A protein has these predicted regions:
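Outer-membrane beta-barrel proteins and related beta-barrel translocases across Gram-negative bacteria
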Residues: 1-175
Length: 175
């Protein structure tokens, strides 16, 4: 019970779809502010996993008494080819305050990204592209950079002396 939201019951429903998939629905009814649904979906494969949280609501925001809002936080991970770890994360919101106000997420910015990483005994590869969404009222053009791509390569090798080791690094960044 809260003076802002009133009485807030939350009812979870859990469904196992099969051996590798499940979903959970959490319904929220805010006595004074509307209703929300949080859906968590998970799925596994041999070398991959997917997990998504989807938020939908018709709640009071600072802009409107009952505004239809939504957000997603999805993550896909996989190990492909010759030991490449792939991660893709999508985090977006249709409105800048409802995630914090209704305690779904406390962040003031959301970062979506795709990365590929490979680690060998003497080499390291990393590639990333990302996009930021600002959840503040400040100038969004400076707080929402898109980085495509960021590439980092590192190689280690023996030096000229017995205990010496050489490391070469190459890094490139595109804003």
């Amino acid at each position: 019970i809260s003076s802002d939201f009133g009485f807030t019951p939350s009812i979870p429903f859990f469904q196992v779809i099969d051996d590798t998939k499940d979903v959970q629905f959490d319904l929220y009814k805010y006595q004074y502010r509307g209703a929300a649904l949080k859906t968590n979906y998970r799925q596994l494969w041999d070398q991959s996993a997917f997990q998504a949280s989807i938020y939908t609501a018709r709640v009071e925001t600072y802009k409107a008494e009952r505004e239809a809002v939504g957000a997603i936080d999805a993550l896909f991970t996989s190990n492909i080819g010759n030991n490449w770890d792939i991660n893709a994360r999508l985090v977006r919101s249709s409105q800048d305050t409802f995630l914090r106000r209704y305690k779904f997420n406390t962040e003031t910015s959301l970062k979506s990204s795709a990365t590929a990483e490979r680690i060998l005994s003497d080499h390291y590869y990393f590639v990333e592209g990302s996009d930021w969404q600002s959840l503040t009222t400040a100038n969004k053009n400076t707080n929402e950079p898109t980085i495509l791509p960021h590439i980092f390569y590192e190689k280690t090798q023996k030096g000229w002396r017995p205990q010496q080791q050489l490391r070469s690094e190459i890094s490139a960044l595109q804003l």
